[in-house]
């Protein structure tokens, strides 16, 4: 049963027709759309204490609405006291309705709660139509209360689109309501 997510409805009712008008697409499948959102949290300190990974995993599951996968070290690096296979982070890939729900929450609740927020950096596109942003703490999400947090942990959020160029991706995200700096 598909959920009625306001941001998804906005994409189909307003954003897609506007993108077709702006870029003159001939085929509906040419129109850029959101493919997935990947949330990554690097936890270098987890190699000493497994409880850190557990706590961070619970927090990320609350934020994303989906249990995160543990990322492990690909190689051993002696300077970092790191062995191959050690858990060093968490990752969640959101698609479909969960992706739309997360983005709606990010845009309407989380980003406005950031102190001194002046807008997202418009230069964080990767050249292939994907957007990356970093958050410094998890407290900006409504599911995380102040009492739950022992250490502020940041995360990287990658918004993957089917757009061919950064210009198309920026137009898509702007129309969806991403607050870019001017």
From Swiss-Prot:
Family note: Belongs to the universal ribosomal protein uL5 family.
Please verify whether the record's keywords include Iron-sulfur.
no
What GO annotations for molecular function exist for this entry?
rRNA binding; structural constituent of ribosome; tRNA binding
Give the encoding gene's name: rplE
Query: Record's superkingdom?
Result: Bacteria
Say if the entry is tagged with keyword Disulfide bond. Answer: no
GO annotation, biological process = translation
What Gene3D superfamilies would the database entry show? 3.30.1440.10
A GO CC term assigned to this protein in UniProt: ribonucleoprotein complex
Name the keywords, alphabetized. Ribonucleoprotein, Ribosomal protein, RNA-binding, rRNA-binding, tRNA-binding
Source lineage: Bacteria, Thermotogati, Deinococcota, Deinococci, Thermales
Please give the subunit comment from the record: Part of the 50S ribosomal subunit; part of the 5S rRNA/L5/L18/L25 subcomplex. Contacts the 5S rRNA and the P site tRNA. Forms a bridge to the 30S subunit in the 70S ribosome.
NCBIfam families with a match to the protein in the record: PRK00010.1
Q: What is this protein called?
A: Large ribosomal subunit protein uL5
| Protein's job | This is one of the proteins that bind and probably mediate the attachment of the 5S RNA into the large ribosomal subunit, where it forms part of the central protuberance. In the 70S ribosome it contacts protein S13 of the 30S subunit (bridge B1b), connecting the 2 subunits; this bridge is implicated in subunit movement. Contacts the P site tRNA; the 5S rRNA and some of its associated proteins might help stabilize positioning of ribosome-bound tRNAs.
Listed SUPFAM superfamilies:
RL5-like
